[in-house]
Amino acid sequence: YGAAIENGPGTQEQIWHRDQPDYALLKAGPGTAEAMLNFFTALTDFTPDTGMTQYIWGSHKRVELGEPDAEHPVVFTKLKAGDTAVLSGKIVHRGSANATPDVFRRALALMIIPAIMTPFDATCHLSRHMVETMTPLAQKMVGRRSVVIPPPHTVGAALGIWCLNMREVGEQMGLKSNQPDKEEE
């Protein structure tokens, strides 16, 4: 999935986080599978004033988010517009504050995740009536609801994956759930 990121003047520094959520199937930390790669492209220059992405060196080998220390120092990326950083979803990082009065910091993040996190086949053949008899969890499993990562693994607004207009896809479609199957009555 992808996201356009815009940090305006006065944007605060983010909290330390990983882009790879803590899925029950794919955990973060050493000796675990890579579950996400982020192709992070700067659309504007990332400077000390507009804010640079900070990484905790070696954090992909730790289970906990942790804080920077002597063995895991902070590394800043000073990207120019058009530069792309490719990083593991396990890397602990954050965006720095934008201290400028009038400059926006913009980026494009394209995340690659394994196909095991999505339905194998398209489910467009399932009627809306049938989908509305399902629970919200079942609707997620057939791609008719957004998958939202629960706290504490979210950063800011919990937008999720597979959204419509940056909102939960089922709500945007007016999708109901747990409806009786009228055909069986």
UniProtKB/Swiss-Prot annotation:
InterPro entries referenced in this protein's UniProt entry, alphabetically: Phytyl_CoA_dOase-like
EC number: 1.14.11.-
Keyword Metal-binding: yes
Record-level Gene Ontology MF annotations: dioxygenase activity; metal ion binding
Keywords, sorted A to Z: Alkaloid metabolism, Dioxygenase, Iron, Metal-binding, Oxidoreductase
Pathway involvement of the protein, from the record: Alkaloid biosynthesis; ergot alkaloid biosynthesis
Organism superkingdom: Eukaryota
Enzyme class: oxidoreductase
Cofactor(s) it depends on: Fe cation
Pfam families: PhyH
Keyword ATP-binding tagged: no
Entry's induction text: Strongly expressed in planta but weakly expressed in axenic culture.
Listed GO biological process terms: indole alkaloid biosynthetic process
Residues reported to bind Fe cation: H17, D19, H93
Similarity comment: Belongs to the PhyH family.
Record's subunit section: Homodimer.
Function description: Dioxygenase; part of the gene cluster that mediates the biosynthesis of fungal ergot alkaloid ergovaline, the predominant ergopeptine product in E.festucae var. lolii. DmaW catalyzes the first step of ergot alkaloid biosynthesis by condensing dimethylallyl diphosphate (DMAP) and tryptophan to form 4-dimethylallyl-L-tryptophan. The second step is catalyzed by the methyltransferase easF that methylates 4-dimethylallyl-L-tryptophan in the presence of S-adenosyl-L-methionine, resulting in the formation of 4-dimethylallyl-L-abrine.
Protein name, per record: Dioxygenase easH
Name of the encoding gene: easH
